[in-house]
A protein has these predicted regions:
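Catalytic Walker B motif of ABC-type/P-loop ATPase nucleotide-binding domains
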Residues: 109-112
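H-loop (His-switch) and adjacent beta-strand-loop-beta switch element
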Residues: 158-170
């Protein structure tokens, strides 16, 4: 999971990884044949457009009924294929976006603030659904999130970003890192209120692994 303050480059990183924007420097290496599913932070669809969930999932190419039903079930909205996209609740809309990302059974699922706008219960359900998807497909999951207290309980590895990698590793190691605390304070429950960080006033120790982490 990638965390960091607003404007730190989290969404830019994901868009670069999927090839949606050019690189100023560096390079991205992708395994041949790697299937990537992407759930954007937001997507605007004209509410006057007569677009059903099924038609949305068939863009840009058509899929069979079984594949669509399976993707919707995995995303947590079974039986909604014939519903209008404009009629979906915020949580259902996000799950429809996830279903679209799951259509080709990706090897890597990327999510950019995909739980944004969900209440606490909806967020918890969303993360549980992600765990089920990971178990069913055996895919890797790379996500950007502001839900720090959830991230630190659910993620296997955390990258703290602020225009560069401040620290990374196991969640317990990251929360103990001074670079992370300079950004978010010491209480991850209140971390969203603290976004103070000078990238030039901390040591650039970019790997802080818990010595017991595998």
């Amino acid at each position: 999971t990638v965390v960091g303050p607003n404007g730190s480059g989290k969404s830019t990183l994901l868009r670069a990884l999927i090839g949606a924007m050019p690189l100023d420097s560096g390079r991205i290496r992708r395994a041949p044949g790697l299937r990537v599913g992407y759930v954007p932070q937001r997507l605007h669809i004209d509410p006057t457009l007569p677009l059903s969930v099924r038609r949305f999932l068939n863009l840009p190419r058509r899929h069979g009924r079984h594949a669509i039903d399976q993707a919707l079930a995995r995303a947590g909205i079974p039986g909604r294929a014939d519903a209008a996209m404009s009629a979906l609740s915020g949580g259902q809309f996000q799950r429809a976006l996830m279903a679209r990302a799951l259509m080709d059974e990706p090897d890597l699922l990327m999510l950019d603030e995909a739980s944004q706008g969900l209440d606490q219960t909806g967020t918890a359900d969303f993360y549980r659904q992600l765990e089920e998807i990971r178990d069913q497909l055996g895919c890797g999951i790379l996500m950007v999130s502001h839900d720090l207290h959830v991230v630190m309980r659910a993620a296997d590895r955390v990258i703290c970003l602020n225009h560069h990698i401040c620290c990374q590793g196991h969640p317990e190691a990251v929360t103990a890192a001074p670079e992370y605390r300079a950004l978010f304070g010491t209480d991850d429950e209140e971390a969203l209120a603290i976004f103070r960080h000078d990238p030039h006033k901390h040591p650039h120790e970019h790997e802080r692994e818990d010595e017991h982490a595998g």
